[in-house]
Amino acid sequence: MYVSKNMDQWQAFIEILRTAFAQNKEQELLTLLLTPDERDAVGLRLQIVAQLLDKRCSQREIQQNLNTSAATITRGSNMIKTMPPEFMQWVKEQLDGQKE
């Protein structure tokens, strides 16, 4: 599984993110660190993952539903394939729980 070119920077990000969540400051931290376009891209990736895990639509339909490129859908699909199945099941449960 590919994580980051610079693991020290990635770990520093994860640690400050953990701290922000523990102190209920995640919104402010992510707003500081991510541009509006980057926040939109993260939201889009979450929608892509949700629809891919739902398995109701083809990748082409997801592309059309979300008005994005085939390459963007493929990147999401490829990343899912690199993750442990148990983790992806957990992600699906979290996403399904948000629908309720």
Question: Model-predicted segments: where are they?
Answer:
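Short, Lys/Arg-enriched anionic-surface-contact patches
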Residues: 26-45
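Short, amphipathic alpha-helical "recognition" segments used to contact nucleic acids or chromatin
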Residues: 42-57
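Short alpha-helical "recognition helix" segments of helix-turn-helix
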Residues: 60-69
